[in-house]
Amino acid sequence: MSRGLGDVYKRQRLIRAWGFTYKSVAFVWLKKNKKAASWFYGLGFWTRANAEVCLLATKGHPKRQAADIHQFIISPIEAHSKKPDETRDKIVALMGDRPRVELFARQTPPGWDVWGNEVEPTAGLWSRWPEDSGKEDVSCPM
């Protein structure tokens, strides 16, 4: 699950609602411009946004397979909202070649189950957003 830094709390609630256990901010993607060596800056309400985070959540008790995986990914932006392929490569190195799902996916990479409104879902999750059991709305970070 990847998105800007805002609403991490709501995303953690959504992770729990789907039966996963939140583990960590696995990766922080620092975005570079496509054609220049400078940083990419998007829009933002308080500050001009650059970083996106990838949250790691699990089911069961998988073991970490590698201890040399670094959190930062510095990579240029690509097509709208496309994440660097390095992100998925690092997840496989970290967790091993096991079943895995990308939530809010925008493409269907080989070897991955996906779920989102821009892909044909292959993961056995809800066909719609899970209901919130609390008083706050659960927003789905797209």
Task: Give the label of every model feature segment.
Residues 10-142:
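Class I S-adenosyl-L-methionine
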